[in-house]
C-alpha cells in the first residue's frame, strides 16, 4: 500500500488565512471605520502561554484583525478577572475574545466559572457551556465550535472523502477536543465512536475507524498496526520525548506512531505542522464570523431594543391602572439595549437606575442626535398635555418608527403629589413607569438638594451668631485651629484669602486687619436671600421666626421655608455641565450681602465642598422607561417661574450621544412657550451650547376657546358647555395666542410643529381648523394627536412631522446679547415675546439692577418670573394682550445657577394643602406593598 498523503496544516491554514484577509478587506470597504476585533485575556506569565498568544497576535495582524492582549499579573483574583470579562462582553467594538488557559494565578480561580462568564456570542474559542450545548444539539450555525476540532474537520474535508456514512473514531474525550470532535462529526453525518482511558480493546475500536482523530496527550499511544487500512488519521497531539540527536535533547511527536501509521493510512497529519496551524486559523475564522454576525444584526447607530406592546382599552383606565398593567422591563436590560456599559449604570432596584457621567466621556466623539423641545401655548389651569405629548412622541419615534429616541423630563416635586396636583408622569397610554416610583422618592435627588440647601441655611445663621458673640482673635482661632501645634488653612480658606487679595498661606503671618477681613463675613441679615426648604406643601412655613431658643441669646430673625424644587441648588443641578462645573456653581451661589454691600457666597461660608459631596450622586441622571419601553431620563425639576423650568443639561447631553446622529432627544419646557421655551433657548441652550432642531408646540381646542373669550376654566370643576360643544368661532378667535407662540418659536430660527392634543369632546372641524390656521401662519406642520388614548400609535403623524422638520433648514439664534444692560435684556423679552409696549422698573427693581451690575452680575441671562396664565402680567388677560406696560417689582439673583430673575408679580414658593389633599386617597397594601391612590 502506498504511503499516506500528508495533510499539510501549514499550507491549508495559509490558504484559509488568505481568504480571511480578503473577507476582512471587504468588510472594511463595506463599512468604513469597521474592523473585526479580537481580545486575549491572560493571567500570569507562563512561557507556553506567551508563545501561543504571540502566534495568535501575529496571525490576527496578518489578516487585518485588530487584536488586543490584556495581560494581568499573577496576583489577580477571580473577581478582577470577572470585571475584565464583563467589560469585554459589553464592549461592542470587541467581536470575539478568549481567556488563555491555564490561568496562572497565586489565587484560586474557578476556570469553569470564568469561561462561562464569556458572552456566548463572543466566545470564539467555543468553550462556554452554551456553545458546547448548542454543538451537542446540532445547532452548528448558531454557536462557536472549539478551534482544534473545527480545524480537524477542515483537514478531513480537505481529503475530499465524504464524511457522511463513515465510521469515525475519536480517541480522547476532553472538553476542548475529544467531546466537541465527537459532536462535530456526528452532525456531519458520521457514525461516531468515542474512546477513552477506560475503553476495553482500544486497538480493536481504533481499527474500525474510517476516520480517526486522536487527542490523548500520550506520545505515540496509537500504534500503526491499529490503523484501519486507508483511514484518514488526524493527530492532535503535541508531546516532547527525549532524543539525543536533537540539540535540545528532545523531539516533538504526536499521539500516533507516525512512521508506522503513514504506511497504513490514506491521509495523515504530521506533527508538528498538521493540526496546530489549523487551530490558530480557526480562531481567526471564528473572529471574522463573529464580526459578520455583529454587522448582520447591527445597523450603524441603531439600538437593538425590545419594545412593549400596549393593550389599549376603551374607556381609558386611570393612569395608575395603566401603569400597573404594563410590566416594565428590567432597567439593567434597557441600559444594555441603549448602549450603556454596566460600570456606567447604578441600579436602584429593577425599574430605575442612575447613569454615571463617565458615559459622556466615553461617547464624547460620537455626533449628537436631533434635539427636540416640547412646549405649549398659554395654558388653561388644567394644562394642555405637554408631558403626555413628550412621552407619546418618543413612544411613536421609538416603538413605531424604530428610531433611537430618548425623553428627558423633569423630576416632579413630592409636595404636590400629596397636595392638589397628584402624580405627574404623562398620562393615559403615554406615561413614564412605574408611576409611583416616578412621583415619590425616585433615587433621592430632591432629598439631597434639601439637605444641601439647609446646610447652607444653617451655615449662614451659625456664622452670624458666632461673629456676633466672638472677638476677631477668638473667631480666627476657631476657624483655623491649631492641630498638634500647627495651624493650617484648608483649601477653601486659601481660596477665600486669594479673593480678598491676601497672598499668604501661613496663618501665623496674617496682620490684625487681615484676620478681621478673613474671619468676618459681616452678613447683613436684611439682605439674606437664602431660605430653608422642604419637599412638602406646608403653608405655615411661609413665614417663621428662627432663633427663639435661649441658647441663641436673642438673635432672632424672620425667615421662611420654600418648597425644595425652588432651591437655587435645583437650578444649579439642571444647568451644570460637569462635576467640576457644579462645584464651581455651588460655590458661586450668593446668599446675602455684607454690610458693605459685597456679595457673600457659599464659597465664603466654606460650605461649597460639602455641598458637592452631598450632590455627587444627584448629578447622575435617573434612567426610567415609558409604557412602550423607550428610555427616559428623569433629572432635575427647577421651578418654571423663579427658575428656568427645564430638565438637566447633563441628561440631554448624555442622551444626545446615546441616540447617535440619526436619533432624537425630546425634552419638555415648563409652562407656555413665552416662559419655558424662551428660557430653554436663552438660558439652557446658552449654557449647554446645544442647538435644537425642532419645536413641538402643544395646543388644545379648549385652550384656544378660552383665549377666544370662553368662560373661565377652573381646576376641579366641570368644563362649561362652550368647551364641550363645537364652536369654530371661539377657536378661530383664540388662535391668536397660538399664532403668537408660533411667532415666538420662529424668532429663534427653529421649525415649529404644532401638536393638536385631541380630547373626546373635540370635533374634527375644530381640530382641522387649528391645523390649517397653524400651517397658514408659519408652522412647519400641524397634526392631530391621540396619544393619551392610543400611546405611540396616536402620535405617529406627529413623529413623522418631527422627522421631516428635523431635516429642514434652520438657523438657531439667541434673543439678546448678555453684554446688554439688565433693563434692556428684560425689555427685549417683554416686547418681543410677550408683546408689551414697554417695561417699568419699580424702585426696588431699579435698585437691584444697579446693585447686581455693580457686583459684577449684570452679564447674566434673564429668567422672567411672571404668571404662566397670560402673555401679560395679568392672568385674566387671555389671547394676545396689547397696549400694556410690564411692571418689574423686584430683581433677584441666582448667581450659582447663572441668571437674574425679575419678579413681575408675587410668586408663591411654598404651596399649601387644600381642604381635601390627595393624601386622603393614598395608601399601601401591606400584603403586596402596592401603592394605591395615585392618579
From Swiss-Prot:
Substrate binds at residues 52-56, 99-101, 272-276. Homodimer. It comes from the Eukaryota. This is C-1-tetrahydrofolate synthase, cytoplasmic. Changing residue 653 to Q: Probable risk factor for NTDFS; decreased enzyme stability; no effect on methylenetetrahydrofolate dehydrogenase (NADP+) activity; no effect on formyltetrahydrofolate synthetase activity. The N-terminal methylenetetrahydrofolate dehydrogenase and methenyltetrahydrofolate cyclohydrolase (D/C) domain carries both the methylenetetrahydrofolate dehydrogenase and methenyltetrahydrofolate cyclohydrolase activities. Pathway: One-carbon metabolism; tetrahydrofolate interconversion. The gene is MTHFD1.
